[in-house]
């Protein structure tokens, strides 16, 4: 039972790191704002509060939080995966660049993309308010038409690497200690979907997690 319950620890830990990164960035920005206005004496308390809340809702702030969160998560789960599960970060060149492996990836990824797109479109048609909530979340996170290059780097490179360490790395290896492969893969994909905390993205993440597992 202890081994099974330990499967859920990475999910709770990565969520805790998200909150820690957010509160750290909020506290640091508040300290800087107060220090700046105290030094210049150019604004009152309400102006400071208004500027601070505007900063917290900006794309630059969200990008900073994402950078801090990814750095912390990669450090924590990278060490966890390496030390506890003997993770190897050196690619096996013969297996990685084997023609069969490359062909499988070329066929698998577009197929997975089409499948998840159809599933998401079907779900969005049944529950349009889920799609509205998802689009609102993307705008709040800065993933809209005005997205910055740094946010693209965080979202396309750092975030997937972090998520692979958490779910296909630590969670999957822990799950395989007490469950057969199919059950371990199903559970890590389910936790991967839950981690995204919205239905549309969660369904997409669940389907993708099954394939990556």
Indicate where each model-derived feature is located.
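N-terminal, membrane-interfacial amphipathic/helix-forming hydrophobic leader that caps
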Residues: 1-102
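Hydrophobic alpha-helical transmembrane segments
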Residues: 4-12, 63-67, 102-107, 149, ...
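Hydrophobic faces of alpha-helical transmembrane segments in multi-pass integral membrane proteins
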Residues: 9-24, 28, 72, 107-111, ...
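Membrane-water interface at transmembrane helix exits
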Residues: 21-33, 81-85, 116-124, 162-163, ...
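Short alpha-helical linear motifs
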Residues: 31-36, 129, 209-213
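Juxtamembrane helix-loop-helix connectors linking adjacent transmembrane helices
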Residues: 89-165, 173, 177
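Transmembrane helix-loop-helix hairpins at the membrane interface
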Residues: 148-213
